[in-house]
Amino acid sequence: MIIRSLLDTDLYKFTMMQVVLHHFPGAHVEYRFKCRNAGVDLVPFIEEIRAEIRHLCTLRFTDTELDYLRGMRFIKSDFVDFLGLFHLNEKYIDVRPAPSNDGQIEIVIAGPWLHTIMFEVPVLAIVNEVFFSRTQTHPQWEEGKRRLTDKLASLKRPGLEDCRIADYGTRRRFSHTWHEHVLLETHAQLGAQYAGTSNVYFAMKHGMTPLGTMAHEYLQACQALGPRLRDSQTFALETWAKEYRGDLGIALSDTYGFDAFLRDFDMFFCKLFDGVRHDSGDPFEWGERMLKHYDDMRAEPKSKALIFSDSLDMPKVIGLYERFHGRCKLAFGVGTNLTNDLGYTPLQIVIKIVRCNGQPVAKLSDAPEKTMCDDPAYLTYLKQVFGVQ
């Protein structure tokens, strides 16, 4: 079986789930799957994907895993007690061929947010591993190792000693086994330049630092949960601050486009949050504008962190490091390029929240192709409310 532990997911699923438990326990949501690769036929793998999901729904947290979570300073004891009773339920997820008959599949996850939030990452990892295990029966392990060695060597150049990367690649990894190899090799080769991993299972198993705060789904759901739509981003950040009281202080900047984020991210938030994460649009322009915004808001840029996580490879990491090093704190989250580069075209697959409490929700990304919404009229209205062209 592909997923062997409920910890085999990203840390931010736990940090968001805790907010859901304490602030939105009655929220209902719907997620949908999308494969952005043209011509990929996933239909032949449906039964195997279903079988893997069936197994996923039998898993429970072990006492050792619960003790590990309890040891995190920002995880509260009542949340761990809840996780002790938690398991994923098959009735909330449906996998079927798409009506278009073009090889696409539909994965619909619908139910209480508290009981569905944990599906996304392991289900994407399942789709990836099933697909590659069936289409690449003799993987090019040596080519993958060569590519990884070259990437890590590029970060060992003089002048890059403070350039640190983290693994954000669980959802689109080639396989569980390859993911673990990549992490161990990266840790061994980079030492202090390896910041940690978003994967909680591997962090626990290998004594690495687990990393993550919030994802777009949290800010999107707040469109339906806050007092009014225009204030939903502010509401999401304020609710986060109420829950974590200054901990986990990295805000995500592109749910409504960067211009709208800067309007909402006022002096209070600039001083309260430790930094901001970039996930779409030109990262160099974004970084310059963010540092200027900190200056304008009288927040010392050198005390703040810029986190880059959008489709990074090593040349882009190095370029960003050279541009911003010394001007602020820096961190880089590398995903697919780290955990799924054996020479094959990776799957561009996502599972996105599309509804909350029966209302459509959407992301107005700085990369238009990342926008995903099943209600065009709502998308138009959302753009109007947030002043997005």
Swiss-Prot record:
The modification Phosphohistidine is found at residue 216. The keyword Ligase applies. GO terms for biological process: NAD biosynthetic process via the salvage pathway. Pathway: Cofactor biosynthesis; NAD(+) biosynthesis; nicotinate D-ribonucleotide from nicotinate: step 1/1. Keywords: Ligase, Phosphoprotein, Pyridine nucleotide biosynthesis. One of its GO terms (molecular function) is nicotinate phosphoribosyltransferase activity. Its EC number is 6.3.4.21. Pfam families: NAPRTase, NAPRTase_N. Transiently phosphorylated on a His residue during the reaction cycle. Phosphorylation strongly increases the affinity for substrates and increases the rate of nicotinate D-ribonucleotide production. Dephosphorylation regenerates the low-affinity form of the enzyme, leading to product release. It catalyses: nicotinate + 5-phospho-alpha-D-ribose 1-diphosphate + ATP + H2O = nicotinate beta-D-ribonucleotide + ADP + phosphate + diphosphate. GO terms for cellular component: cytosol. It is an enzyme of class 6 (ligase). The keyword Chloroplast does not apply. PANTHER family: NICOTINATE PHOSPHORIBOSYLTRANSFERASE (PTHR11098:SF1). Catalyzes the synthesis of beta-nicotinate D-ribonucleotide from nicotinate and 5-phospho-D-ribose 1-phosphate at the expense of ATP. Belongs to the NAPRTase family. This is Nicotinate phosphoribosyltransferase. It comes from Ralstonia pickettii (strain 12J). The lineage of its organism: Bacteria, Pseudomonadati, Pseudomonadota, Betaproteobacteria, Burkholderiales.
